[in-house]
Every structure is written in structure tokens, then in C-alpha cells.
């Protein structure tokens, strides 16, 4: 699993952003190396609410950054992974789960 920060960088979390960008490249490299025997894909979520106990500050931050005006949950990640598993043709791809954050 990568992270949306792999595409935009982070002034506060340089090492984290760099490591997620490296995972993005690793997804591409492994997909090229091991095709057609193995499909290699990843997901890159942005702000996701994992439970209702996430702080109000976290929830407000997520809402402000989403053009969908809602907070994604772990269910969105599960659906993306299921989609990637169900495809016989997709490899070397990353699905961004951002609620449109990349559009702002």
C-alpha cells in the first residue's frame, strides 16, 4: 500500500513521502519483472477514517480536502483491492483513493 503523499510530497514528513514514492516505483518494477505470472498493484489512500473514534479535528481536515464532501472509510480500500484482485489484465497500477483530494 502506498499513499497519496507519494504524488504530492510532504514538507513535514519527508522520509515517509519518499518511502511511499519508492513503493510506487517498486509496484511498477515488480509488475514488469514478474509478469505474466504475477500481477502487482497497489492502492494509495488519502485521509481515511478507520473508526468513529477518530478525532473531530481529523474528520474536519478530511472533509475540507475532499471534493466529495465526505470521508472515505476502510470499506473504500477493500473495494479497490477486490477490484484489483478480480481483474485478469491490470498490473503495475495504483488506485488513488482520495475522495477527489487531488483535484483541489
Residue ranges with predicted function:
Residues 3:
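Residue(s) in the substrate-gating loop at a strand-loop-helix junction
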Residues 8-14, 69:
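Active-site loop immediately N-terminal to the catalytic Tyr-X3-Lys motif
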Residues 16, 24:
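Catalytic tyrosine of NAD(P)H-dependent dehydrogenase/reductases that use a Tyr as the general acid/base
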Residues 19:
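Active-site helix of classical SDR
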Residues 31-36:
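Alpha-helical segment proximal to the catalytic Tyr-Lys
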Residues 39-49, 85, 96-98:
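Conserved SDR Rossmann-fold cofactor-binding beta-strand/turn motif
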Residues 57-76:
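Catalytic Tyr-x(3-8)-Lys segment
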Amino acid at each position: 500500500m502506498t499513499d497519496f503523499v507519494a504524488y504530492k510530497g510532504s514538507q513535514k514528513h519527508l522520509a515517509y513521502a519518499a518511502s511511499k514514492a519508492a513503493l510506487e516505483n517498486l509496484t511498477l518494477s515488480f509488475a514488469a519483472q514478474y509478469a505474466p505470472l504475477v500481477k502487482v498493484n497497489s492502492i494509495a489512500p488519502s485521509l481515511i477514517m478507520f473508526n468513529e473514534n477518530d478525532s473531530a479535528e481529523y474528520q474536519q481536515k478530511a472533509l475540507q480536502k475532499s471534493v466529495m464532501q465526505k470521508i472515505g472509510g476502510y470499506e473504500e480500500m477493500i473495494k479497490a483491492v477486490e477490484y484489483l484482485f478480480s481483474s485478469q489484465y491490470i498490473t503495475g497500477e495504483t488506485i488513488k483513493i482520495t475522495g477527489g483530494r487531488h483535484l483541489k
